[in-house]
């Protein structure tokens, strides 16, 4: 069994996936647009350039995503994508990149269980936890 995360965006899925590809080292393997739907499938007017389905390989996992109408889109509130990083420096670098123009929930700092731990919502509405675990606590 595999468990993948499917992220919804309020019209900026392509921008989010391109950002994650560039900044996190992912690889977009598919982007299908609403404009590519067969003519027999009902379409949302004006959504030809919006993402119907996207797929990105990121480390050992896969992120999936799509655009949804902005009147139903809400930023993530009850779940976080969690990055477990190898060094404090890598954690600090990615925290700075992801938090730019986003919202910080918990500043990046040392805790009793991690050399670095922080929580944020990025500019695209995706919530993240970044952790550089302490070796004696991680397992």
Q: How should each PLM-predicted stretch be described?
A:
Residues 3, 29-32, 50, 57, ...:
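Vicinal oxygen chelate
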Residues 77:
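Acidic/polar active-site rim loop that often engages polyanionic ligands
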Residues 7-60:
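Core segments of cupin and vicinal oxygen chelate
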């Amino acid at each position: 069994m595999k468990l993948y995360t499917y992220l919804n965006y309020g019209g900026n899925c392509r921008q989010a996936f391109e950002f994650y590809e560039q900044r996190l080292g992912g690889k977009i393997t598919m982007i299908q647009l609403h404009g590519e739907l067969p003519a027999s499938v009902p379409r949302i007017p004006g959504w030809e350039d919006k993402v119907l389905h996207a797929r990105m390989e990121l480390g050992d996992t896969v992120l999936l995503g799509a655009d949804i109408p902005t009147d139903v889109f809400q930023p993530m509130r009850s779940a976080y994508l969690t990055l477990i990083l190898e060094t404090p420096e890598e954690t600090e670098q990615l925290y700075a990149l992801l938090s730019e123009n986003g919202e910080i929930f918990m500043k990046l700092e040392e805790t009793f269980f991690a050399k670095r731990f922080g929580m944020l919502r990025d500019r695209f509405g995706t919530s993240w936890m970044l952790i550089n675990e302490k070796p004696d606590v991680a397992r």
